[in-house]
Structure formats: C-alpha cells, structure tokens
C-alpha cells in the first residue's frame, strides 16, 4: 500500500536527507510528493501528512526563522530587584527570563521561575546569584543542530547573536518542537475563539 511504502521511506529519512546516496535516488521533493499522494489516496490523514512534511523540512530551517526577536523579549537587568523580576514573571507568563548586564546586547544568563521563587523564599536578594548559564548561537544555525545542543546541555533557551555580537533574539526548545509538531498550547497562551 502507499502508506507502507511511505513509512518504509520515512524510516530511511535521516540518511536520505543527510547523505543523498546515489542508489537511493529519492529527493526531498519526491518524498513530499509521496506524502501528498498518500494523503490524497486516503493512506494518511491531514495531520499525519503535515507532521511528515514538517519533519522533512525540519533539517532545512534556520534559527533566524523561529526566534523571538529582541524587540519582543521579556528580560531583566542583572541588578533588578526581586520584586521587579517577580512582576515580570507574573505579567509575562514565561517560566524563564533572560538576564542581561547593562544592555540587552549582553545577556549573561537565564533565571527559571521555579529557581527564582525558591531563592526568594530563602531570602536571596541578588538575581545574579541564581541565574543559570545561557547558550549562544547564530541565526544561520540549523534548528536541528540547536536542538541537539540544547538537549545535550539540558537547556531550554539560547541567545541568538547577530554578526556584531549583539542580541538578535532568543530561541527556545519549545519554538523548535513547535516547528515539528505545530503549536503547543499551554495555560499562558491566549485563547482565540473562532466564530
């Protein structure tokens, strides 16, 4: 059946994309065509075919295509008071906030909401004492590579730097996963009702 053939090819996808061996002879475009054909013939439903298409395109996407730009960042200055940071967490709904030194172009760490409130409860008053290291990347890094780096380092966020070393934005593990599986709703996302 078309679905069986497609899933056989699906299992071979990583080697097809990264090694393009002569004997295989299947391009990404041909694989997408097979997915479309399987969907049209009823072998795949719309969601399955979308997931497969996203997986095929996943290796081509760059961090610059998924980042949150610097103008939309919620970040705290390293010398911010605990009350100011608590307000940022409450107003933004984010679980991690980048910490910068003097300017947003100098992000020096990230603080997790859970760690922040635990430290605040213990009486900690210095934000720089509870920040975690942050990872840096460039906009032309493939998101599949950034995902491996974040997973290897058990991190959820990377600062995307521009060609001058300034902050272009941030990319999160959630941003990467959403490119593969679609939007992930959480309790802080705005609900939009369609009529």
Regions found by a protein language model. Give the residues of each.
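Soluble cytosolic regulatory domains appended to membrane proteins
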Residues: 19-195
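Hydrophobic alpha-helical segments of integral membrane proteins
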Residues: 1-14
């Amino acid at each position: 059946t078309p679905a069986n053939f497609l899933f056989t090819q699906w299992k071979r996808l990583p080697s097809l994309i990264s090694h393009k061996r002569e004997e295989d002879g299947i391009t990404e475009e041909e694989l997408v065509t097979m997915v479309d054909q399987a969907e049209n013939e009823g072998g795949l439903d719309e969601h399955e075919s979308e997931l497969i298409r996203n997986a095929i395109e996943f290796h081509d996407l760059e961090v610059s295509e998924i980042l949150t730009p610097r103008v939309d960042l919620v970040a705290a200055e390293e010398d911010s008071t605990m009350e100011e940071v608590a307000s940022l967490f409450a107003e933004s709904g984010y679980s991690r906030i980048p910490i910068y030194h003097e300017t947003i172009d100098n992000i020096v760490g990230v603080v997790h909401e859970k760690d922040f409130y635990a430290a605040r409860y213990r009486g900690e008053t210095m934000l720089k004492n509870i920040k975690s290291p942050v990872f840096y990347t460039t906009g032309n890094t493939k998101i599949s590579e950034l995902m491996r780096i974040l997973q290897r380092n058990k991190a959820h966020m990377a600062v995307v730097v521009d060609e001058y070393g300034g902050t272009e934005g941030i990319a999160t593990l959630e941003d990467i996963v959403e490119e593969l599986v679609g939007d992930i709703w959480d309790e802080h996302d705005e609900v939009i009702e369609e009529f």
